[in-house]
Amino acid sequence: MVDAAGFESVAQCPRELHQMMAAAADGLGSIALDTTQLNMSVTDPTAWATAMNNLGMVPVGLPGQQLVSDSICVPGFDPGLNMMTGITPINPMIPGLGLVPPPPPTEVAVVKEIIHCKSCTLFPQNPNLPPPSTRERPPGCKTVFVGGLPENATEEIIQEVFEQCGDITAIRKSKKNFCHIRFAEEFMVDKAIYLSGYRMRLGSSTDKKDSGRLHVDFAQARDDFYEWECKQRMRAREERHRRKLEEDRLRPPSPPAIMHYSEHEAALLADKLKDDSKFSEAITVLLSWIERGEVNRRSANQFYSMVQSANSHVRRLMNEKATHEQEMEEAKENFKNALTGILTQFEQIVAVFNASTRQKAWDHFSKAQRKNIDIWRKHSEELRNAQSEQLMGIRREEEMEMSDDENCDSPTKKMRVDESALAAQAYALKEENDSLRWQLDAYRNEVELLKQEKEQLFRTEENLTKDQQLQFLQQTMQGMQQQLLAIQEELNNKKSELEQAKEEQSHTQALLKVLQEQLKGTKDLVETNGHSHEDANEINVLTVALVNQDRENNTEKRSQGLKSEKEALLIGIISTFLHVHPFGANIEYLWSYMQQLDSKISANEIEMLLMRLPRMFKQEFTGVGATLEKRWKLCAFEGIKTT
């Protein structure tokens, strides 16, 4: 028989039991039942057999073995069993029950220990019996079904037993010895399932109404399923939000919005086009404006100035390209030097191997050493040959490039160079002609625009000024037409000179062939008839003199034509420059502009050319004292009127 005083002593010290339950909740160990609080010994098999006989249970025959071990586990417990994704598996330990994680294997039957509460006692089932069965766990299950309760069990007793598993939110008790318990968290259900199979006895009574075998199982509840669905939807929203943030982070940035065209925005864009750092952004805006069709007669001048600013960056880009090409050439040179050094070291290594294979040193090596040296030598020679072929290929390419750049001294090549120079000058004049034609079209457009404005406005002072501008533009247009005709005549003259040079070349070649045949004939005559060498030398001298005289005449004619053509070209360029500068320009300004077109021209040459044409250019003095400055102006239109 179990001593009743022992249970009374357990009931009288709830503080010690509470401390034991709190210590068991930390998951670091287990606290067995304090044997000092019971009169019966935990290790006494006779006392356990007597107590189990009183309950109508078959006593466990484990003589001499401790029934409740210091470290006991939850049999067959899986922390991740039927639990939702995202919930961290926890240690299935019930506070106050003295339970710890299981070390023994599943094949060994684990003995549960007796659980004492204030109002009842829980006895474990026979460890030889199979564990109680459970149904499939519903998703988000927080509610358990508890059956086999004693008839006299109250909600307070049930709460006292199951509140050790966790916070209880609701208990629904039925009159048929079962109830439903809803916990605050899902992992608490696993702790409650552990109590399935325990026999519950109220107090120390042996009445059937005060005892019953507990059956704890999962229960379906709409509230649990609804909360589980809410959590799933919340996780899905979080996942979608996370994916959206990731897509936004990986998506390339959208291009900046392009503002609409206005005169103010056009002025700002013109300033940006002149800045190298903002050029790429500004050129995109300019392209979009032109594609949208913002160009009309009123905005044509602004767009022309912006296109001109864009064209001014071509020289900068070419300079950058030249810089990169220079860097590439330097890198090629460094690579070639490094390759030469590597090839030199390969030659030295191969020389070492060749010296090692000579009879004087080869006899002292073993067979294995000779084999290794032979393999190394062959490998080094293959690498040396490959490097040498690569270096020779680089040198071959450089020689081909140099041969393309070299100039031959033959007379036919000189004539070809002269022809190419004339063709280049003709092409330059053609480009200048096209440029003047485009300027003429621009002036015509301006004249038409002024005519339209004149028809729309009344005859006022502003109209009078516009009439003057119109007359001035007409005069300018006439002057440009005259310049265009003059340049066309020069172009035709150059074409005729080019044809004449070709004819002279063919004539010179024919003359050379004839003289060569005559020379050959004279040599034959000398050999056959025995003429003296002096006659042959005289013939050669006469031939060379004729050829040289012909060459000198051709070069004099060509140099005189080139000189007059250059002066005409300079006059046309200076006239165009001074025409767009109605207030005149000093000689330094003119020289800086012409220096960009011809780097060999000097300021003195320009000034002498201007002084030779007093009807086209005149010199004026502006300013007083230290600000006194000489300016050259275009007076060709005034000179035409006076003549």
Curated annotation (Swiss-Prot):
Pfam families: ENOX1, RRM_1. Keywords: Biological rhythms, Cell membrane, Coiled coil, Copper, Electron transport, Membrane, NAD, Oxidoreductase, Secreted, Transport. Disulfide bonds: none annotated. InterPro entries: ENOX (IPR038876), ENOX1/2_dom (IPR056611), ENOX_RRM (IPR034140), Nucleotide-bd_a/b_plait_sf (IPR012677), RBD_domain_sf (IPR035979), RRM_dom (IPR000504). GO terms for molecular function: NADH dehydrogenase activity; protein disulfide isomerase activity; RNA binding. PROSITE patterns: RRM. Its EC number is 1.-.-.-. Its main location: membrane. One of its GO terms (cellular component) is external side of plasma membrane. It is found in: Cell membrane; Secreted, Extracellular space. Its cofactor is Cu cation. GO terms for biological process: ultradian rhythm. Not inhibited by the antitumor sulfonylurea LY181984, the vabilloid capsaicin, and retinoids. CDD domains: RRM_ENOX. Residues 142-221 form the RRM domain. Residues 307-342, 425-521 form a coiled coil. It is an enzyme of class 1 (oxidoreductase). Belongs to the ENOX family. Probably acts as a terminal oxidase of plasma electron transport from cytosolic NAD(P)H via hydroquinones to acceptors at the cell surface. Hydroquinone oxidase activity alternates with a protein disulfide-thiol interchange/oxidoreductase activity which may control physical membrane displacements associated with vesicle budding or cell enlargement. The activities oscillate with a period length of 24 minutes and play a role in control of the ultradian cellular biological clock. This is Ecto-NOX disulfide-thiol exchanger 1. It comes from Mus musculus (Mouse).
